[in-house]
């Protein structure tokens, strides 16, 4: 029973729950970014450089074929277009995270409080100093 209660205590800590929420939101955000890149950003870029569909860009190392027994042999392909899409997705996600962290840092930095006036002791010492100065000016013979 000790291990179960320890696990429950671990799982219910704030950090673990925050992490779980972050993972779920991150997965959903990843899908949004994927759709943004594949459906909104890359098509105009592909159109601008000559109607290129980045998701279909690939180097065919060995074309598909059929062996002697009639069995189909799939092509060997390096799909660099998908890699380009993934890099663009990464840049967008990294920039979004940068903006969020920057916002959090800005919000967490407390503005320094306005400097408080001098303490009562300092005010009293100033008053004594000024009083002594005035006495010295009025009666310069007093040592």
UniProtKB/Swiss-Prot annotation:
InterPro entries recorded: Mechanosensitive_channel_CS, MS_channel, MSC/AndL, MscL_channel
Q: Which residues cross the membrane?
A: 16-36, 84-104
What GO CC annotations are associated with the protein?
membrane; plasma membrane
Membrane topology listed for this record? Multi-pass membrane protein
Please provide the Gene Ontology terms (biological process) for this protein: monoatomic ion transport
> Which of UniProt's keywords are assigned here?
Cell inner membrane, Cell membrane, Ion channel, Ion transport, Membrane, Transmembrane, Transmembrane helix, Transport
In terms of domain of life, where is this protein from? Answer: Bacteria
Q: Where is the signal peptide?
A: none
Its localization reads:
Cell inner membrane
A GO molecular-function term, please? Answer: mechanosensitive monoatomic ion channel activity
Q: Does the keyword 4Fe-4S apply?
A: no
Any single Pfam family the record assigns to this protein: MscL
Its annotated function is as follows: Channel that opens in response to stretch forces in the membrane lipid bilayer. May participate in the regulation of osmotic pressure changes within the cell.
This protein's assembly is summarised as: Homopentamer.
- What family, per the record? Belongs to the MscL family.
Identification of the protein by name: Large-conductance mechanosensitive channel
Which species does the entry assign this protein to?
Answer: Xanthomonas campestris pv. campestris (strain ATCC 33913 / DSM 3586 / NCPPB 528 / LMG 568 / P 25)
What is the gene name? mscL
